[in-house]
Amino acid sequence: MIHLVDYALLKPYLTVDEAVAGARKAEELGVAAYCVNPIYAPVVRPLLRKVKLCVVADFPFGALPTASRIALVSRLAEVADEIDVVAPIGLVKSRRWAEVRRDLISVVGAAGGRVVKVITEEPYLRDEERYTLYDIIAEAGAHFIKSSTGFAEEAYAARQGNPVHSTPERAAAIARYIKEKGYRLGVKMAGGIRTREQAKAIVDAIGWGEDPARVRLGTSTPEALL
């Protein structure tokens, strides 16, 4: 199952030395991708040979103007193999769908064919919001729906009626919707995945086997999934 893991070190206080050590651990473990903030991308890029470099964009809030998001993703595409970009959450919650559509089509296009995972921040969404957002993500040509930044606010999530961490139930619902719609999208679950048992339950709930082109698990503790 380790080959499905996106090993993420995204805390704001991460040091350069810790980012370098993380890259070496990623190579040693054989994870799918090593995920870092943009500042570390040039530092860790030369250290990754087997493992893909994933860089986050507009993380964790999804609050930059579209022009800034396009410029950032375009630059990241020069160094990253994969880009995890946060959806414009405020626009989603405002249900300004035309603006969300314009943003994501432009931002995904700026990645120049790199694998793009759009972070929906599931803990913050009502069903009518999440399913409309999934439709737009598919239309934009992204490659994965990613469930969370891992930085979601528990109190707000509770007011929306959602758990703050990944669950098999949410994983199954995302996969089911993708299948029903016939979308060519993978599922990446992230947020609170800290044991092999949790990971297996989520992968089983998705029901697509263990293909990293379709299923990913985001965690900061990959060794716990061995």
From Swiss-Prot:
Compartments, record wording: Cytoplasm
Superkingdom in the source lineage: Archaea
Reactions catalysed: 2-deoxy-D-ribose 5-phosphate = D-glyceraldehyde 3-phosphate + acetaldehyde
UniProt GO molecular function: deoxyribose-phosphate aldolase activity
GO biological process: 2-deoxyribose 1-phosphate catabolic process; carbohydrate catabolic process; deoxyribonucleotide catabolic process
EC number: 4.1.2.4
GO (cellular component) term, any one: cytoplasm
Family named by the database record: Belongs to the DeoC/FbaB aldolase family. DeoC type 1 subfamily.
Protein name: Deoxyribose-phosphate aldolase
Organism: Pyrobaculum aerophilum (strain ATCC 51768 / DSM 7523 / JCM 9630 / CIP 104966 / NBRC 100827 / IM2)
Taxonomic lineage from the root: Archaea, Thermoproteota, Thermoprotei, Thermoproteales, Thermoproteaceae
